[in-house]
Amino acid sequence: MSQGLPAAGSVLQRSVAAPGNQPQPQPQQQSPEDDDRKVRRREKNRVAAQRSRKKQTQKADKLHEEYESLEQENTMLRREIGKLTEELKHLTEALKEHEKMCPLLLCPMNFVPVPPRPDPVAGCLPR
């Protein structure tokens, strides 16, 4: 006889199940207490899942509100930066005009070399 082959009179029986079609164990008789416990567990699980989904939704809503608030604040701050930049430009121009005709700066007795100033606008603008 060759190895691995069944004897002539024996019959091999295999249960062939399609993939995904695992044979399901037959449910045993459950007592009413088991049924009640199962129903209570499912109800408790359902309530917990509902609570979790509600909490997740509330968290997302809160994050969205915070996002909107920060966007508004950001817009206000950008407007303020624009206004302050314009004010700085006007004041710088006024100072330059004043320096041209200021008698204290034009007096030869008060001749003090004034070092050139860096552009104040460039240092204030966001990069």
Swiss-Prot record:
Keywords: Activator, DNA-binding, Nucleus, Phosphoprotein, Repressor, Transcription, Transcription regulation. GO terms for molecular function: DNA-binding transcription factor activity; DNA-binding transcription factor activity, RNA polymerase II-specific; DNA-binding transcription repressor activity, RNA polymerase II-specific; RNA polymerase II cis-regulatory region sequence-specific DNA binding; sequence-specific double-stranded DNA binding. Residues 35-98 form the bZIP domain. Coiled coil: none annotated. Residues 63-91 are annotated as: Leucine-zipper. One of its GO terms (cellular component) is nucleus. Residues 1-72 are annotated as: Disordered. Belongs to the bZIP family. Heterodimer; heterodimerizes with JUN family proteins. Interacts with JUN. This is Basic leucine zipper transcriptional factor ATF-like 3. The gene is BATF3.
